[in-house]
Amino acid sequence: MFRSFASPLALVATSAIASNPATTAQHQGSFWIQTFGCQMNKADSERMAGILEAMGYHEAPAELEADLVLYNTCTIRDNAEQKVYSYLGRQARRKRTHPHLKLVVAGCVAQQEGEALLRRIPELDLVMGPQHANRLEALLTQVDNGQQVVATDDNHILEDLTTARRDSTICAWVNVIYGCNERCTYCVVPSVRGKEQSRSPEAIRLEIEGLAARGFREITLLGQNIDAYGRDLPGITPEGRRQNTLTDLLHHIHDVEGIERIRFATSHPRYFTERLIEACFDLPKVCEHFHIPFQSGDNDVLKAMARGYTVERYRRIVNRIRELMPDAAISTDVIVAFPGETDAQFQNTLNLLEEVGFDQVNTAAYSPRPNTPAATWSNQLPEAVKVERLKQLNALVERIALQRNSRYSGKVEQVLAEGINPKKPQQLMGRTRTNRLTFFATEGPQGCRYSPGDLVDIQINSVRAFSLSGTPCEQTRSRH
């Protein structure tokens, strides 16, 4: 859907806006972007911030001081969606006394609700789905012309035309595939993110080369289902396989000078291949950290979720990773209290957590989402069961995480310093190759001082469930 309104009551046909060239009008106002949800949303927000700065906007010191407020929203769980409406209500009240304020809702709630958002919050100026992030300037031009705009049509995503305003100068998100073609029965992502659209390997490498030239040292390749990268691109190899896969992309970008670390997320067990595992082992810049959601440790629940794999397949993936890379970190996502989940099936999930020994786990109790099959089923579990199972799950996750981190005590780990610890300015914080958050002093042996962007060898002397602390060793690789 693509609509713009001269007022909340009058419809103006402007569907051609999607192909209009961006304007060059300069704005003197300020903006504030609030991001909810996943890494894809964070990357989209960086892109939109870059567009706004190119238009002449500057970032406001606080949300309530901004001339343009943009909420980049998430609908994967109900509590995230309700939080957005709370923020919007506050800004809608503000706009009644500050009519110059531009109020924008982007992301998945915008895609899901569309024009209904205008009826619920008539103070909105722009409602735009995630496929329109790169069209922000053209859409705001319509707003400047006095129209309310809804942009939720299923569009080909424009190649990145504007330099993103990165929230870090060390680590960068790089979108490589948008959308998702899976049909998991609980998930709203395909209906709000659209079908899979892979960027070309050439465009991705060009972006990464630009990041390296600006001093970035780590990149994370992003996709809702990153293992599906390239299956919508043309080309077959003489061996009969797809010419463009995530494995091929890793080889294609690996030699970009200046980039020290490469990560990727999020993987799907159904498409996680032996060839990909071997590439991660062979390519030294690819970090030994794999985010592979398993969602449930019970095959019947996985079938009801339409996940397309079994617990046995998941085990084989984990075993092969650890066979080649024994110290690799594996993180995951888990949903408990899915409709119809029995006590025994829940216990199977806990058993798999114990068996694998995950390093990090994103946990959630099932939340019915609009336009998903599971939301219509009659075997929904009581809220009390959801709360209790999530409580048990989180307790186990924390215990396992502490056990896994305890293995690092006394060891020396290479840490990429990402910034100052906001709670202790005398400390830097960064991550190991296995994605452990690590804190250490800004000053090392013999008065050596470290800065964000340095690769520092840290001797770990304190472990917690979700972070490490340590002391710098002499060896360091400066960013400069």
Curated annotation (Swiss-Prot):
Question: TRAM domain: which residues?
Answer: 406-474
State where [4Fe-4S] cluster 1 binds.
Answer: 38, 74, 108
* Single GO cellular component term: cytoplasm
* Radical SAM core domain: residues covered: 166-403
Cofactor(s) of this protein: [4Fe-4S] cluster
Primary enzyme class:
transferase
> So where does [4Fe-4S] cluster 2 get bound?
180, 184, 187
Q: Could you say which EC number(s) this protein's record lists?
A: 2.8.4.3
**Record keywords, A-Z:** 4Fe-4S, Cytoplasm, Iron, Iron-sulfur, Metal-binding, S-adenosyl-L-methionine, Transferase, tRNA processing
Is Transmembrane there in the keyword field?
no
Report which superkingdom the organism of origin falls in.
Answer: Bacteria
Q: Which PROSITE patterns match?
A: MTTASE_N (PS51449), MTTASE_RADICAL (PS01278), RADICAL_SAM (PS51918), TRAM (PS50926)
Which Pfam families has this protein been placed in?
A: Radical_SAM, TRAM, UPF0004
Per the similarity annotation, which family is this?
Belongs to the methylthiotransferase family. MiaB subfamily.
Q: What is this protein called?
A: tRNA-2-methylthio-N(6)-dimethylallyladenosine synthase
Species annotation: Prochlorococcus marinus (strain MIT 9313)
